[in-house]
């Protein structure tokens, strides 16, 4: 059987129309623009209002990616949505499939928090390499504003909403060069959006649990320690599998969590700042959307050129992490 390669042939993104900057946040919690920027690098974030949804953002980002790739929705074989904040707990990918008019596409959600997009990328690539599908649409989208405690300045300053998408296509030359994924459930409590059960008696002798999800909780110091250790290791392992030296990288594309984290990982890998893609100043941490959103911006700005080699890494709740080395088509 002839080996089937994988290429990324298009990208797209979408952000909500409502903006919340640090000055406005200082009216909600005890903080300041200087405090937030010095600790996170974030200046503002975009937030979904009642007229928008995860589905609407994801659909908009997908259409932009399809347009760039010159592919119609009817050509899509598979849609994978990476999200932790679906419009419907049963899944949102199928609704996106319907909105796009991608009738023949199989569609499903995956949940790996801020690592989700890279897990989706690796998953989609396997369907192509196995000869099952030709065109795979990958979407990373999250609306974390739904689950933020807006009175907790440790977390409310960090998160924003958004969506990003890329299109994978089978090709003769393989542009997905290497990857490394990891999980560590022993540190699950460091970053969580937990279900809080409430007891409800439905009949004598029968009690069920009907509760809701609690706002995002995070141990920032432990997450930082985990990322600075695991992410450089994952990137180095992925580079080894790709047989590429680190100095051959054109770009480092990390999950846009915190500028301190981006700087620390780049320093560990001896990657100069001019090779580090960062847009979290304008969007904050958009979870699964952050990598495709940042990628789409630099592609459309003309910074990323055909043939550029990119090391992408996502990390977050689970705890989970992943790194992918790919070449822009």
UniProtKB/Swiss-Prot annotation:
Q: What does this protein do?
A: Catalyzes the condensation reaction of fatty acid synthesis by the addition to an acyl acceptor of two carbons from malonyl-ACP. Catalyzes the first condensation reaction which initiates fatty acid synthesis and may therefore play a role in governing the total rate of fatty acid production. Possesses both acetoacetyl-ACP synthase and acetyl transacylase activities. Its substrate specificity determines the biosynthesis of branched-chain and/or straight-chain of fatty acids.
Molecular functions (GO terms): 3-oxoacyl-[acyl-carrier-protein] synthase activity; beta-ketoacyl-acyl-carrier-protein synthase III activity
Please tell me whether the keyword Lipid metabolism is annotated for this protein: yes
**Location within or outside the cell:** Cytoplasm
Q: Which reaction does it catalyse?
A: malonyl-[ACP] + acetyl-CoA + H(+) = 3-oxobutanoyl-[ACP] + CO2 + CoA
Q: Which keywords fit this entry according to its UniProt record?
A: Acyltransferase, Cytoplasm, Fatty acid biosynthesis, Fatty acid metabolism, Lipid biosynthesis, Lipid metabolism, Multifunctional enzyme, Transferase
Q: What is this enzyme's EC? A: 2.3.1.180
User: Domain comment, in the record's words?
Assistant: The last Arg residue of the ACP-binding site is essential for the weak association between ACP/AcpP and FabH.
Instruction: Tell me what this protein is called.
Output: Beta-ketoacyl-[acyl-carrier-protein] synthase III
Species: Trichodesmium erythraeum (strain IMS101)
Task: Name the major location.
Answer: cytoplasm
User: What gene makes this protein?
Assistant: fabH
